[in-house]
């Protein structure tokens, strides 16, 4: 009804105007205003359902898109929390591995140093023992050589000083000293 009353107001304004160049045709049937009003009413009446359904469909799609986005956001937040937990666990494991590696390195270092000290002591003792053995062997060789030289010298002196008479005298003296023992 608002359209029709607005239309009548427009007609009344046109009748009031006395301008001959431009004007409003007050004859509704001639101006086709009635046909336009009926057509416009039909478009509004029929288009209202289409427009309403189109807007409702669009609203539903937007609502679904928002819900999907919220669900993806929640899933992303859950995945982020899981990833942060895994990162924290990985960092903890890395720290433990570093500590164990440092501890193992210290233990290996201490073991190697201790083994090195033992090896040095063993080599030192073996060296001392080898030196002592070499010294004893050299001393024995020197003593043997001195003994051999002394025997040769005494033998040489004996040959020059020992005559047959002196040999008989030495033998008789030795027999006499052994005299009662035989």
UniProtKB/Swiss-Prot annotation:
It is a single-pass membrane protein. GO terms for molecular function: ATP binding; proton-transporting ATP synthase activity, rotational mechanism. The keyword Chloroplast applies. The chain crosses the membrane at residues 33-51. It is found in: Plastid, Chloroplast thylakoid membrane. Keywords: ATP synthesis, ATP-binding, CF(0), Chloroplast, Hydrogen ion transport, Ion transport, Membrane, Nucleotide-binding, Plastid, Thylakoid, Transmembrane, Transmembrane helix, Transport. CDD domains: ATP-synt_Fo_b. InterPro entries: ATP_synth_b/b'su_bac/chlpt (IPR002146). One of its GO terms (cellular component) is proton-transporting ATP synthase complex. Its main location: plastid. It holds the Pfam family ATP-synt_B. F-type ATPases have 2 components, F(1) - the catalytic core - and F(0) - the membrane proton channel. F(1) has five subunits: alpha(3), beta(3), gamma(1), delta(1), epsilon(1). F(0) has four main subunits: a(1), b(1), b'(1) and c(10-14). The alpha and beta chains form an alternating ring which encloses part of the gamma chain. F(1) is attached to F(0) by a central stalk formed by the gamma and epsilon chains, while a peripheral stalk is formed by the delta, b and b' chains. In plastids the F-type ATPase is also known as CF(1)CF(0). Belongs to the ATPase B chain family. F(1)F(0) ATP synthase produces ATP from ADP in the presence of a proton or sodium gradient. F-type ATPases consist of two structural domains, F(1) containing the extramembraneous catalytic core and F(0) containing the membrane proton channel, linked together by a central stalk and a peripheral stalk. During catalysis, ATP synthesis in the catalytic domain of F(1) is coupled via a rotary mechanism of the central stalk subunits to proton translocation. Component of the F(0) channel, it forms part of the peripheral stalk, linking F(1) to F(0). This is ATP synthase subunit b, chloroplastic. It comes from Guillardia theta. The lineage of its organism: Eukaryota, Cryptophyceae, Pyrenomonadales, Geminigeraceae, Guillardia. The gene is atpF.
């Amino acid at each position: 009804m608002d359209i029709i009353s607005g239309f009548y107001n427009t007609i009344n304004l046109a009748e009031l105007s006395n301008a001959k160049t431009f004007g409003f045709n007050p004859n509704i049937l001639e101006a086709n205003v009635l046909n336009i009003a009926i057509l416009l009413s039909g478009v509004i009446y029929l288009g209202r359902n289409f427009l309403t359904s189109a807007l409702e469909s669009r609203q539903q799609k937007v609502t679904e898109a928002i819900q999907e986005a919220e669900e993806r956001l929640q899933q992303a937040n859950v995945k982020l929390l899981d990833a942060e937990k895994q990162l924290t666990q990985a960092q903890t494991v890395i720290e433990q591995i570093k500590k164990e590696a440092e501890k193992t390195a210290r233990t290996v270092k201490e073991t190697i140093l201790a083994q090195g000290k033992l090896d040095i002591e063993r080599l030192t003792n073996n060296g001392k023992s080898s030196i002592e053995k070499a010294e004893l062997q050299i001393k024995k060789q020197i003593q043997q050589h001195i003994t051999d030289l002394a025997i040769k010298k005494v033998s040489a002196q004996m040959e020059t000083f020992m005559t047959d008479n002196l040999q008989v005298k030495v033998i008789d003296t030795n027999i006499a000293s052994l005299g009662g023992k035989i």
